[in-house]
Curated annotation (Swiss-Prot):
Residues 776-828 are annotated as: Disordered. It holds the Pfam family RdRP_2. Transmembrane segments: none annotated. Residues 515-628 form the RdRp catalytic domain. It comes from Tomato aspermy virus. Residues 782-810 have a biased composition (Basic and acidic residues). Belongs to the ssRNA positive-strand viruses RNA-directed RNA polymerase family. This is RNA-directed RNA polymerase 2a. Interacts with replication protein 1a. Keywords: Nucleotide-binding, Nucleotidyltransferase, RNA-directed RNA polymerase, Transferase, Viral RNA replication.
Length: 828
């Protein structure tokens, strides 16, 4: 009988029976009782592969032929010489020496005498015992009426020379007497089932079915076909067919008679191609809230209604050097008339009130604890080199020489006309008589939306504003406005500042696709600026045409300043750091960012450079090369190169349309957070809400410019930046399109408790008139008759109209306060 293997079974080469095997099968089927003890198959058809292994002195007298295949050892096994096989033990042969020793200790359990084992370990002997024990367990050679020992005990006995493979009667009785102590479970011995079924024989010729020409294997295959795992996972490369007779005869009890078919799955047919499918969900508030729940998981559970109350009432400690508190003449809190409440919960914060503790928290984060990351440098020489590098990298020398005109007077009159409601020419002070080192301080009432999932552990703090009063700002703002306009005119073509009348983020004939982006994120930008940055600004202003004495004067009262928050009674000295509300804030931050960028990177490798305050973005064909570590070691900045970098600046994504032009799109994640704003004042005519709506429409004017190409870009850039699903962006854009259509749709996103109360109180029943109840029935009838007369216009006394109407009004007011049941009884 041919050797069985899974490969031969699957390709159909195993199972070809000889005439001798057919005769043996017929004889065994005719008289099964006489088969026991009879020779199974002629010896010429079964080739037994065995090896005689000789061993060293540690395994003396042992061989596979003499010790384990002799008649004295297995005399109870009929046909043992012809059926004993050498089973494969590849899983043991592949083990290392140490792993085999561990297995040897577990199975053989030798006795340890120090470093000596009894019996000693021999790799060849142990592997032979494993093979022989496996053949004894697997091959059907043992007496079915007796119980074999477990496999580890078989290996131990064979290795020790004790050839006892069966359990004794006492051991079998001990095993059978063991009962399960777990309630609800019962165990009973199970007889070994052969599961042998005789192959089908042809009634015409008497041959086995698959050898008979009358046997229709195709019909049998169709009848026995079942859905298996192969229908879900097609297996290719299987050729040949295994019929039931061959499968059962050779595998016996190891397999069930199941007919297997292997076919390829058909290609799915789609009515609409996947690339043309679009979401068709109707835009609703619930759908928008579901997007917020999945995109901002920590924001939807965030409620800071009482956070500031906790700060005001809890114990408070803060570490700030040289701070002064004045609690005697604090300004009273401004009482407002309430705010509209958003329907969407997007994690927006409540309006912050500038109390003493809130201001101290903001100063601690925004002004105090200045980082010290840079080393010692020559400030004068380094500032001159950085300013000169700035001019060579960004400025067009020819334009700078020809554009030497600065129109300060016209800018001054434009500034005064803009603020004429609060400022006049008579209010302008004498700058020589003013202390320009003194700055006012306040905290912003609104908090910038957070896009990180940290609201469950971190409370956002408001930003601070350090500013001069309007009369002083009006003296410097026209000068810096004129300088900034000249600065924009003299820039090279590849540099863009997205502010003012001559520049924006809409770039013609430029595509952001197929380019490398470089975005530098600068943390703690305002308070990290020191004397080096101040000297760099002074050098650049002098090169742009600012009078030297004015630039020096401006820088002098920025070296050491004093800020004071009158409302909170907090004041402290600061030095060098950026004043966030003066006339030079945006211009100065942009100059500092550009100068640091030019020193750390070669700007000639970029096709486009965009700067705005502390934001920067560069586009290049090749990967940018530079040293961003200089931001920290030289300029005292906490800088991070954004990876993966996307075209994103000023909270906007840059996209390219089908005509090769670039336009900007506000960040959808920030816009959806603004829809849940809690700082819109409550007005009777919705003036504030309408202003908020118009601002929302102005920011989303790009919607008419969007098509499928730009939406695909936006979805991809959104996934790269935030690592969130970009499929929600299409639904968000649909919501933006709905709520920018008209103001009535936008009003669905906000409500007011006062408006709800007024709406409830507007519903009244004018016909329900209730008289005062008395104990006598006559008074009740009289009240009913009087009420009936009042309801009849023909019988009503016009001389008592005013009196009756006042009574009806009083009774209606009492009806609202009485229970409904009592009122209905009295109204009859």
């Amino acid at each position: 009988m041919s050797t069985f293997s899974l490969e031969n079974c699957l390709n159909g080469s195993y199972g070809v029976d000889t005439p001798e095997e057919v005769t043996f099968i017929r004889r065994r089927d005719a008289n099964p009782s006489a088969f026991h003890g009879e020779e199974t198959v002629p010896s010429n058809t079964t080739e037994v592969h065995s090896e005689s292994v000789s061993y060293s002195s540690d395994f003396e007298g042992y061989s596979c032929d003499s010790d384990f295949t002799g008649d004295n050892q297995y005399s109870s096994f009929d046909g043992a010489d012809s059926l004993l096989l050498s089973y494969d033990i590849d899983e043991y042969i592949d083990l290392s020496e140490s792993e085999l020793r561990v297995l040897f200790d577990e199975m053989v359990q030798p006795i340890h005498f120090g470093m000596v084992l009894s019996p000693t370990f021999s790799r060849n002997r142990f592997l032979s015992c494993l093979s022989l024990a496996k053949s004894v367990v697997v091959a059907p050679l043992y007496d079915p009426e007796r119980t074999l020992r477990p496999f580890p005990e078989l290996v131990k006995n064979l290795y020790s020379g004790v050839h006892d493979i069966y359990l004794s009667d006492s051991e079998e009785a001990a095993i059978s007497s063991v009962t399960d102590t777990i309630e609800g479970y019962t165990f009973s011995p199970r007889d070994v089932v052969d599961n042998y079924e005789p192959p089908p024989l042809c009634s015409v010729c008497g041959l086995i079915a698959y050898q008979c020409p009358h046997y229709d294997i195709n019909s049998l295959r169709k009848n026995c076909a079942e859905m298996t795992i192969a229908h879900d996972y097609p297996i290719e490369g299987l050729c040949g067919l295994i019929d039931d007779a061959t499968l059962l005869k050779n595998l016996g009890s190891f397999l069930l008679p199941i007919q297997c078919e292997y076919t390829k799955l058909p290609e799915p047919t789609l009515i609409t191609p996947p690339e043309l499918t679009r979401p068709t969900d109707r835009v609703t508030v619930d759908l928008l809230q579901a997007i917020c729940d999945s995109t901002l998981p920590t924001h939807v559970c965030y409620d800071d209604t009482y956070h500031q109350t906790f700060i005001e009432n809890a114990d408070y400690s803060v570490d700030i050097d040289r701070v002064r508190l004045k609690q005697s003449d604090l300004l009273a809190k401004v009482i407002d008339e309430g705010h509209l409440k958003p329907v969407l919960n997007t994690g927006s914060g409540q309006k912050r009130i500038g109390t003493t503790r809130e201001v101290l928290c903001a100063i601690k984060k925004r002004n105090a604890d200045v980082p010290e990351l840079c080393g010692s440098v020559n400030l004068k020489r380094l500032s001159d080199d950085v300013a000169e590098c700035f001019m060579l990298s960004f400025m067009n020398g020819d334009k700078l020489c020809s554009s030497n005109f600065i129109n300060i007077v016209s800018d001054f009159h434009a500034y005064m006309s803009k603020w004429q409601s609060v400022l006049s020419y008579d209010d302008l002070p004498d700058l020589n008589a003013e202390n320009l080192q003194f700055y006012e301080h306040m905290v912003k009432s609104d908090v910038k939306p957070s896009v990180t999932d940290t609201l469950n552990i971190d409370r956002p703090l408001p930003a601070t504003i350090t500013f001069h009063r309007k009369q002083l700002t009006s003296q410097f703002s026209p000068l810096f406005t004129a300088l900034f306009q000249r600065f924009q005119r003299c820039l090279t073509k590849r540099v863009i500042l997205p502010v003012g009348k001559i520049s924006s983020l809409e770039i013609k004939d430029f595509s952001v696709l197929n380019k490398f982006c470089l975005e530098i994120d600068l943390s703690k930008f305002d308070k990290s600026q020191g004397e080096l940055h101040l000297m760099i600004q002074e050098g650049i202003l002098n090169r742009l045409g600012c009078p030297v004495h004015i630039s020096k004067w401006w820088c002098d009262f920025h070296r050491m300043s004093y800020i004071k928050d009158k409302r909170a009674g907090v004041s402290m000295p600061i030095s060098f750091q950026r004043r966030t509300g003066d006339a030079f804030t945006y211009f100065g931050n942009t100059l500092v960012t550009m100068s640091m960028f030019a020193w750390c990177y070669d700007t000639s490798q970029f096709d486009k450079l965009i700067f705005s305050g502390d934001d920067s973005l560069g586009f290049s064909i090749k990967a940018p090369v530079g040293d961003p570590s200089l931001f920290t070691s030289l300029f005292n900045m906490e800088a991070k190169v954004m990876e993966p970098s996307v075209p994103y600046i000023c909270s906007k994504f840059l996209l390219t349309d089908d005509f090769g032009n670039t336009f900007s799109v506000p960040d959808p994640l920030r816009e959806i957070q603004r829809l849940g704003s809690k700082k819109i004042p409550l007005d009777e005519d919705d003036r504030s809400l309408h202003a908020h709506f118009m601002s929302f429409v102005d920011r989303l004017k790009f919607l008419n410019h969007m098509n499928q190409t730009s939406m695909t870009q936006l979805s991809l850039f959104y996934e790269m930046k935030y690592r969130k699903s970009g499929d929600d962006i299409l639904l968000v854009l649909g919501a933006f399109n709905k709520y920018t259509a008209n103001f009535n749709a936008y009003k669905e996103l906000y409500y007011s408790e006062k408006q709800q109360c007024a709406l409830i109180n507007s519903f009244s029943i004018s016909d329900l008139i209730v008289g005062r109840g008395k104990s006598s029935k006559a008074s009740r009838r009289k009240a009913v008759e009087s009420n009936g007369k009042h309801r009849d216009p023909s019988t009503r006394d016009h001389s008592k109209v005013g009196t009756d109407e006042s009574k009806e009004t009083s009774t209606e007011e009492t009806t609202q306060t009485e229970p409904q049941g009592a009122g209905s009884q009295k109204s009859k």
